[in-house]
Amino acid sequence: VCHSTREMQRGPVLDGLPEWYLAEQLRNFKSGHRGKNPANRAEALMGTAMAKVETEAQLAALARHFAGRKPQPYIRVVRGNIAIGRAHYATRCASCHGAKGEGKPEIKSPPVNVQEDWFLLDQLRKYANGQRSVHPSDAGGLVMKAALAGLSPGDFQNMVAYIARDLTVTPPLQKVGPPKK
């Protein structure tokens, strides 16, 4: 329920994210590097849920399960200026996340081309306002915060709109209208 494309209060779709990244994030939740900031309610819920994962084998099985699934189509909801977003992505994101948003495992940088646009926008906002990556040992989070410095909320929307339109590996999910008579 929490990590699907069903539209309700939920977390991001995890399907298709790399196993190494999922395992690393689960370990961060388990250790308290993520999920302990009360201002970030969604992560706090995940931090609590991780108490049920008792062993490294369970954690690895979860990561393997989601990594083995195909990325899910989703309804694009973030709008922005694609040209501005492309320019910001090229100068602020591509060196770590790849020209096509594929990520770079050698520097522990996840792909952004499989994630839903609403979640990417939410995470950019949380990095910028200090709700994500507040743990001092989160080097990747510190890099993210620095990369976003000086950008506006509109710039975030433009970058995410560009990613969702030009880089995503999932086709858009069309809204379903009323049945034809």
Segment roles from a protein language model:
Residues 1-7, 78-102, 175-181:
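Sequence/structural segment immediately N-terminal to covalent heme-attachment motifs in c-type
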Residues 8-11, 15, 19-24, 86-90, ...:
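Sequence context surrounding c-type heme c attachment/ligation sites in exported
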Residues 1-2, 96-100, 107, 121, ...:
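Short amphipathic alpha-helical segments, especially helix-boundary/capping motifs
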